[in-house]
């Protein structure tokens, strides 16, 4: 959806790409910056030069982890999603109070809590502007968000109470922090241009690149249906974020329903073919049992009549 939101009323097509990096190959901001440079170069090569390249692409990155949180009213462990770029443009989670954190924030000490964590620390959700500690370091609460309520996201998110914080801030708390998910929306002047740029220039390693803009197309659903049973085998060392697991769950259901639809659509055709074959078979039997013998008999009778006439004509003229 981010691709369509970013496109707006423009005639230019946009494509949404997700890159999932193995946990033992996670990358830093320097590689993101290098990819952005290559991305801009590729856009220029495609004759898409404009004054402000940021209008041709938008990106976000994230990683997950665990932190200890505390306030004057409570403490505990929480799941953290450390984010950078325009993360909440890609994932517009509903705000209950306060505001999102963005890359434009001068200070990287603002965090977003989910409802469960807000109730643990302060017994409510209207807590924007209050302070808390993460691993002993003071942070300011920017707001509270509501977790997605659809059945797929609810099933996919299993980390319990959690928070969102800036990737920069998280990197200061955790020495081995690294980006494991990179998301991109960019101009796609020709089919697979954006996907090709990502495959060519992004440091994906053994990870996986997903083209989200066409992931629910009919052809892809049929392909996924053929992969039933092996699709769930993950051998690349990638830990998908919960939103990707939710999307893959939706894909599985769509692939199954597509297969059912194809089978249902094919049944009348198959039935008609079977009936046609049976009719032809019966027609052949009738032809062999009735029509052909009669035709042979009539032919033989016609031959006998002609032979008799010839004989009569010959012997009759002799007698005269």
Annotated model-derived regions:
Residues 56-101, 105:
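The feature marks short, hydrophobic/small-residue-biased sequence motifs that occur predominantly
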Residues 81, 111-112:
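Conserved beta-strand elements of the Class I
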């Amino acid at each position: 959806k981010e691709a369509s939101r970013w496109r707006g009323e423009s005639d230019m097509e946009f494509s949404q790409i997700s890159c999932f990096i193995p946990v033992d190959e996670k990358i830093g901001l320097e590689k993101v910056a290098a990819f952005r440079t290559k991305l801009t170069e590729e856009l220029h090569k495609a004759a898409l030069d404009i004054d402000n390249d940021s209008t041709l692409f938008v990106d976000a990155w994230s990683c997950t982890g665990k932190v200890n949180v505390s306030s004057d009213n409570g403490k505990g462990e929480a799941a953290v999603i450390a984010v950078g770029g325009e993360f909440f443009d890609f994932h517009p989670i509903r705000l209950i109070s306060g505001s999102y954190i963005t890359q434009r924030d001068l200070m990287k000490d603002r965090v977003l809590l989910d409802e469960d964590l807000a109730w643990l620390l302060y017994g409510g959700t209207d807590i924007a502007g209050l302070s808390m500690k993460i691993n002993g370091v003071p942070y300011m609460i920017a707001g509270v968000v509501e977790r997605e309520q659809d059945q797929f996201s609810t099933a996919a998110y299993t980390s319990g109470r959690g928070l969102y914080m800036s990737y920069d801030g998280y990197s200061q708390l955790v020495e081995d922090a690294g980006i494991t998910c990179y998301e991109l929306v960019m101009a796609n002047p020709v089919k697979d241009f954006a996907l090709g740029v990502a495959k060519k220039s992004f440091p994906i390693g053994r990870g996986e690149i997903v083209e989200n803009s066409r992931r629910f197309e009919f052809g892809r659903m049929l392909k996924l249906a053929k992969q039933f049973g092996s699709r769930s085998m993950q051998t690349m060392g990638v830990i998908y974020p919960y939103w990707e697991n939710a999307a893959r769950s939706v894909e599985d259901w769509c692939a199954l329903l597509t297969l059912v639809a194809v089978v249902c659509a094919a049944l009348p055709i198959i039935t008609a073919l079977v009936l046609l074959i049976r009719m032809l078979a019966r027609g052949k039997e009738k032809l062999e049992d009735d029509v052909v013998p009669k035709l042979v008999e009539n032919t033989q009778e016609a031959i006998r009549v002609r032979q008799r006439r010839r004989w009569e004509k010959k012997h009759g003229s002799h007698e005269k």
